[in-house]
Amino acid sequence: MTAPLTLLIVEDETPLAEMHAEYIRHIPGFSQILLAGNLAQARMMIERFKPGLILLDNYLPDGRGINLLHELVQAHYPGDVVFTTAASDMETVSEAVRCGVFDYLIKPIAYERLGQTLTRFRQRKHMLESIDSASQKQIDEMFNAYARGEPKDELPTGIDPLTLNAVRKLFKEPGVQHTAETVAQALTISRTTARRYLEYCASRHLIIAEIVHGKVGRPQRIYHSG
């Protein structure tokens, strides 16, 4: 069995980093979740805790995450990096890919998509640690993890077609906006269930997810029709 991992979130917006951490805590396989708000803190935590996976934002108060990524590559750091950034320009994407990032997620991140990334990461790590020599099929599975998707006619575990259809109907009209709480109230389901369906819809580009910062309190995740 693969040993639990330490995961480091490098994100300067503390409430957003805490939202990511809260989601990841419900995913098995990560024993410790650390938060760093800038590159200096990230370097210190990497040196001290040796996280197996780093969720790295690109634009930080004291520099760019891509520069830290280059440092890790030059140091032959054994952990993996997932870029979590609003930078969708192809130059940054290409640079990150050349550095060997495990995945590249554009903000606002759909948590269903983040969950898929973390699941693939754990599966690949388990395969690398559990076998001494690999067959071509196993190598193909490792390298084709990004290309494989769920069959179009199949839904992932925990997504019921009737409930999914009910959620999608709430967004029929242009400009409709909901939160997990309003969907939960409308369909008489729990907020956790509502959030799961909303994140699934966002990951399939059926709706759009955004983070809205209020004057006080934590940022709120809003979902709306395109």
From Swiss-Prot:
Phosphorylated and activated by DpiB. Residues 180-199 bind DNA. GO terms for molecular function: DNA binding; DNA-binding transcription factor activity; phosphorelay response regulator activity. The modification 4-aspartylphosphate is found at D57. It holds the Pfam family HTH_64. One of its GO terms (cellular component) is cytoplasm. Disulfide bonds: none annotated. Transmembrane segments: none annotated. PROSITE patterns: RESPONSE_REGULATORY. Residues 6-122 form the Response regulatory domain. It comes from the Bacteria. NCBIfam families: PRK10046.1 (NF007467). This is Transcriptional regulatory protein DpiA. It comes from Escherichia coli (strain K12). The gene is dpiA.
